[in-house]
Amino acid sequence: MGSMKKSIQWSAVVILGVTACTPALKLTPSDADVVLARQILEAPDPGQPGSFRVQRLYYGSGTDKNRSEYRDSVAITTPTVDVSKMVSLGASASERNDYWDFTPKEMPLNARVWYPDGEGPFPLVLVVHGNHDMRDFSDPGYDYFGELLASRGYILVSVDENFINGGIRGENDARGWFLLRHVQLFEEFNAEAGNPFEGKVDMSNIVLMGHSRGGEAVANAAAFNNLTHYPDDASLKFDFGYDIKGVISIAPVDGQYLPTGRPVVIEDMSYLTFHGSHDGDVTSFHGLRIYDRMKFNDPDTFNFKSAVYVYRANHGQWNSVWGSHDSGPRSARILDLRGLIPEEDQRRFAEIYVSAFLEVVTRGDKSYLPIFRDHRVIGEWLPETMYITRFETSAFQPLANFEEDIDVTSGSEHGVTIAGDSLATWKEANLLLRSSNRANTSASQDNQGVTVGWNNRMAGPDTTVHGPTARYTLGLPAGLAADWRLSAGSTLDFMLAPTNDVPGPRKAPTSEDDEEEEEDNEDDETDAAGRGGDDDEEEEDPDVDLSIELLDSSGRMARVTLSEYGAVRRPLDTYVMRRGDREAARFQTHWEMILQTYSIPLRDFLADNRSLDVRQITQISFVFDQVHAGEVIIDQVGFSDLDPGFLGARVEGN
């Protein structure tokens, strides 16, 4: 298992569509033909319609000035609400009040509903849009979710919040509060004799879904659900406490609402977030921050979180009204739209993941869990693009998350030590986001990781001379593996991603003169980007791969190769703007640094060495033996006692 494996073909860019006035389109070549080559999961496709006939209705004020469906077509008339403590219209108040014919003291509870024709009770799913032109109504844009999910036995409610769209700020707390107020309506509908939803709503199975600002709003709602008072004005009392089982954030913002100056934390439920690389509006994956802050307080209660980065997806195509125009009507002049995946493919991905998430979270159908551990098991279902995925369960126990102190030799769990051998780079640092337009909300992932770089070649004209193989090792205290009850069914989990940097060859000075000569050689062999080169090679930097090694207290070792457990990719090239100067001004880099989760069953190490005692593991090593040089970022190293469902389908070879 020590031989070099190269399953991912790498090239810097694909150059397409060069004309006199349009710059070349730059995309990382797709590896979908390899990564998505198999269909292992045998469960039914969750993105296909179910057996229920779909019914539709509107509810609302019945007096809407601008929208006939909420004026003339409401099946249920609902009250107005006072959100003036949360919504300030500022200088636009007069214009907005004239347009809508109401103020924040009397805003409506409007929504369109898709629901199954059946007895029920059915799980309740609410979706809320984000910010957009308030006159270009956003709530119809999730019709594709409505049709699919209602046919599969869910009540899908698309909430109207267009009246707080447009040019106002500081309203994302209200967006979340509105969602809970709509949940309260369904509690009333469910109990009301003669109501179309009488007895049909499963109030013990609620999921909140939001897009853009709505993606942060659902996190706010999940937090508000457990509070008795509004954090920013305790005179406003809350009385919710609903059984919210999961939250879904689609291309969310984060940090627009900071109650008492602190970010919102979701606790003890399941979470799904996804984001497109070519998002021209929310230009960084802010859902990763919500994901990282999420807390599982009870390891014995099953919950999980999942994040997916979809290459070449944009912001607006998650909504059928918004489409490809992430920067408004003039998007084609501002954004480079040529690299986007088709909108039907983008929504097909969303249908699969959202539906599978709902099946797991509301119905306990764990046959879909493998999708979240390793997307490669559904290669035939997924649109042909590249995906970077993360997942973690409530059963994860961290050894090192690189958050607790400034000592690079200590782990997060007491007694865990860290050591490096023959490394060119070893540092812990905050991970950045590519967007630089807001320093407090857009520049950082708010998450630490460790950067490890290596070059096993020795400096000099003979490129066949190598030093000791570089490695990065976590040492476990005696008894920890036994205390954690590690077994063949446990998994070693971590996040990792290569960077674009490649250190130069190692120096091995034997004297002052030799040291100067080595430095001269290194200067000759390192290009302007800091990448090591070889005199006799013209090829691109090799694909990154490495080995993962376990050692027990008796010195028995087992090793697997990382690429067997998922693609190991350098950052994916992302150019959103048509003009290079605008791209450079808006973004720190032309890629987003997204770490991939790798989940390796300990039984795979036992397959390499049956004598390994997993109850006596003392070391975990990242061994850089597959390519001579590279650099990776590592985070969240630990063990999980996964629900067996996660391993119910696995790509052959891992």
Enumerate the language-model features and the residues they cover.
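Alpha/beta-hydrolase-fold serine-hydrolase catalytic core, especially in secreted/extracellular enzymes
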Residues: L25-D31, Q39-P44, Y311-H315, V321-G479, ...
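Short conserved active-site loop signatures built around small residues
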Residues: L25-G120
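Gly/Ser-rich "nucleophile elbow"/oxyanion-hole loop immediately N-terminal to the catalytic nucleophile
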Residues: G118-G120, G170-E216, F224
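Short beta-strand element of the alpha/beta-hydrolase
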Residues: P121-G130
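Short amphipathic alpha-helix adjacent to the substrate-entry channel of hydrolases
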Residues: F137-V157
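Hydrolases whose catalytic domains are alpha/beta-hydrolase-1, hotdog thioesterase
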Residues: A217-A221, V282
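Active-site-adjacent alpha-helix of alpha/beta-hydrolase-fold enzymes
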Residues: V265-E343
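Extracellular ligand-binding interfaces
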Residues: T463-N609, D625-G648
